[in-house]
Amino acid sequence: MDTEYQSFVETLRAGQKPEFPAHAKTIEYARELDAHDKLSQLRSDFNIPTKGSLRKKALDGGVAGETKEPRVPNGVSSATKPNGTVNSDLKDDEASIYFVGNSLGAQPKCIRQYIDAHLETWASIGVNGHFTSFDNSPLASWQDMAAACAAQSVDLVGAKSANEIIYMNTLTVNLHLMMASFYRPTAKRHKIIAEWKPFPSDSYALASQLHWHGLAPATSLIEIHPPNPTGSSPPTLTLTTSHILATIDAHADSTALLLLPGIQYYTGQLFDMARITRHARARGIVVGWDLAHAVGNVELELHAWGVDFAVWCTYKYLNAGPGALGGVFVHGRHHSFHRGGGGSGGVGGGRGEGGDGDGGDGGDGDGMALGYRHRLAGWYGADKAVRFEMEKVFWPAEGAAGWQVSNPSVVDLACVRATLGMFERVGMRALRDKAVLLTGYLEWLLLGLLADGVGKGGDGEAAFRIITPGHPADRGSQLSLLLRGGLLEGVSKELADGGVVVDVRKPDVIRVAPVPMYCRFEDVWGFITVFNRALDRCA
């Protein structure tokens, strides 16, 4: 089975479909795959919500999956029902099928240790925690925490060095900060190219940035639509690379910024970031990527691809918790810092890395006046050597850290540092290997349901279709299922009642994401079993 497992991975990596045996539809086969999964032990490092904990209505001191008896405020055992009888439903202790890591990752158990270390540091040495860390602490001093997290992320995002990364704020705030620095419209180049169905927060950010510059989305925002998305049957919801490149060419002379998602949140489509970036930059367009669904999900080479900037969150595939700090990548060619700049007082010493002739101003003029690329500045973006000297003159910190504005939340950074350590130990290649097989197995079983006519309507219409691209190189860990009209509410309830957690997007889509760090092949089989039953009952 080891050989077969690896053969499946290699086949999928090559863009082909593996030939699963007929008995692959059984739970025994799914368990065989789990037995040969070299990453299976990672699951024990997470708190996976149980079927019982998902129904919890009040805090009781317990944590899903822990074997110790939870503490209950009124002293009644959690194994006792409200009427005083013992709850014999052992299924309450079973882990749920948690296929929603594309919305919020499961909780790593080690996060408590990191948060406790921060709280003890704060309680023990107070303000000195800004500059001091304990020898046996997993944390750096508070003012060095963001940089420590950046150092952990070099391989994760494919940066040249930690200088190209910083953790701060949350994703949309960081997107605004990056656009304030990199979207510098002129009378000739004022357009932003985006895709037709971005996450709403990105739409709000794009529109507000255009309005900030006195521009109108109707004339300055180009949305790339699928060719005839409503006229074909079934409608096309994804974008081909050639169509994206053609749109870039059509608007190249008037475009200032291209901003796309690495993975489209709704369809789960993974874009060819290397080719698109290269094509746009060759036409003088600044390229930014929203990597909310890509970091921790797929392999990235942001520096080698020449990406100007990128932003991402850490609460999805990175598992750092709801609202955790976001990440930012700024290519080294934008780090230039020339002594003698004027304007608002920026001075420096010619720092920068990976320069390719762009300098520090990106051609907008302001950078040469300031001595560095224009940005919205704040005290935490100042050079650490002078940060506490209370100077009025802004001296940017080296690299992406120079785009910081405010003191980051250390308790959030503790969570980020904890989970990044897990990615350091495992590596993205191993995670991606498992991910392509998990998703490939899920797709094969789903296609089996369609072939069997499960849930087919009276007019012969299928119960669902997979709107995520079929080629493994064109998707991450998510498969999006577009249900036949009228099925979503009933199917969603059946899934929830069966202990399955997925993301529901009205009117008709469920997003299914078996994340390789903590999801099993048995979970994939279990999802298919519950989904099959749901379609039978609701069709």
From Swiss-Prot:
Keywords: Cytoplasm, Hydrolase, Pyridine nucleotide biosynthesis, Pyridoxal phosphate
Region (Disordered): 60-87, 340-363
GO cellular component term, pick one: cytoplasm
A GO MF term: kynureninase activity
Pathway it works in: Amino-acid degradation; L-kynurenine degradation; L-alanine and anthranilate from L-kynurenine: step 1/1; Cofactor biosynthesis; NAD(+) biosynthesis; quinolinate from L-kynurenine: step 2/3
Primary enzyme class: hydrolase
Cofactor dependency: pyridoxal 5'-phosphate
PTM-bearing positions, type N6-(pyridoxal phosphate)lysine: K316
Alphabetized SUPFAM superfamilies for the sequence: PLP-dependent transferases
Subunit structure comment from the entry: Homodimer.
HAMAP family: Kynureninase
Function: Catalyzes the cleavage of L-kynurenine (L-Kyn) and L-3-hydroxykynurenine (L-3OHKyn) into anthranilic acid (AA) and 3-hydroxyanthranilic acid (3-OHAA), respectively.
Full protein name: Kynureninase 2
Organism expressing this protein natively: Chaetomium globosum (strain ATCC 6205 / CBS 148.51 / DSM 1962 / NBRC 6347 / NRRL 1970)
Phylogenetic classification of the source organism: Eukaryota, Fungi, Dikarya, Ascomycota, Pezizomycotina
Gene giving rise to this polypeptide: BNA5-2
